[in-house]
Amino acid sequence: MHVAINGHATRCRTVSFDADDNSVQLIEQRLLPHEFKIVAIKDFRGTACAICDMIVRGAGAIGATAAYGLAQGARSYRGRRLTGFARHLDTVYETLKNARPTAVDPVNAMNQVRAAMRSGETVPEQQALALAAAEEFANEDVQHCEAIGQHGAHLIRSGMNILTHCNAGWLAFVDVGSATAPMYAAQAQGRKFHVYCDETRPRSQGATLTAWELAQQRIPHHVIADNAAGHLMQRGKIDLVIVGSDRTLGRTGEVANKIGTYTKAVLAHRHGIPFYVAIPLSTIDWKLKSGFDIPIEERAESEVLGAWGVPGSAPRRSGAWRNKVQYLRVANPTSPAFNAGFDVTPAELITGIITPAGIFKPRELWARRRQLGGPD
């Protein structure tokens, strides 16, 4: 997408790779919306930490980051023996896989890279194939999101108020996004609408990232408290809900997404509001048979017990926000916290799943698995 930096529009991707210094290039999302910065991560362990620490986050973005990280780790190997290289690659794979356990995109992305590497007969050949496959995954992610936009745009009519949760925009993918893709496509087709962004505590990705994206795209929006969605639905001020997913079960249609998604689905169902989930094919898990089998990441208590931000009086001129983002304890100083990062929404609460191949009912996914890149 195009980003306005110091008054100039610059096109950039959330994730990219610099082959010259074997570094993964990431937008430092923890600084947004107050500062735009691209960081270079130069080894696979650092790339795994960037995923875990949420320098980069979002299903497609961490999938592409893991794919590049696997290629990065492969390219860092200096030996010539394939047996030693295979052991090294296993270490790289497991390190990246364990960075964020709930999302399935990193595993699918790395499996795609490893499958491509098998045709190489030497270490250098496999290293080259790894980077080519990672680039292919990243480009495919963009293509999938563009297709999601085209399929989902017709759901949006002029005058609508749309609710979204967390950030499933271009920052959560390589470009374009999933939940935002229909919005961007509808905007390009001339439709005018308004978006409510849940703040999405505790990391506030809706208030910081989605709101920043929509402002960049000049789409009218308001940030709302997480608990305000029910009130707005009750008053008839929300017409449509579109969210993303970190893992969607192809066998059942259940959806794991940022904590609070299930709550919004229950509210939408109660008020008869269509609730859609937008996903690329890499987000589909064809193996698990129940949402209760999805590993739910539990993050640090500090995320719930405090908040990040900048002083309200800080100047807004270029560069003035640097190093101003700070953490403040909000909760009672002796209280602990529980911090599940995700929840699971059952299929019966979901109106449809927007995919690159079209829109399907959640329980249709298994029957359409060949069309959606699933098993035979």
Q: Can you annotate each of these PLM segments?
A:
Residues 1-45, 52:
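Positively charged, low-complexity intrinsically disordered leader regions
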Residues 25, 31, 37-47, 77-95, ...:
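PLP-dependent amino-acid enzyme catalytic core
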Residues 27, 65, 69, 163-167, ...:
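Short beta-strand segments
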Residues 31-33, 70, 169-170, 247-250:
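A short, flexible beta-alpha/helix-coil linker loop
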Residues 38-44, 169-173, 250-256:
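Short, glycine-rich nucleotide/cofactor-binding loops
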Residues 39-55, 154-162, 246, 323-336:
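Short, hydrophobic/aliphatic alpha-helical segments
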Residues 53-224:
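N-terminal active-site beta-alpha-beta segment that forms phosphate/nucleotide-binding
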Residues 192-193, 198-376:
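Conserved phosphate- and dinucleotide-binding cores of soluble alpha/beta proteins
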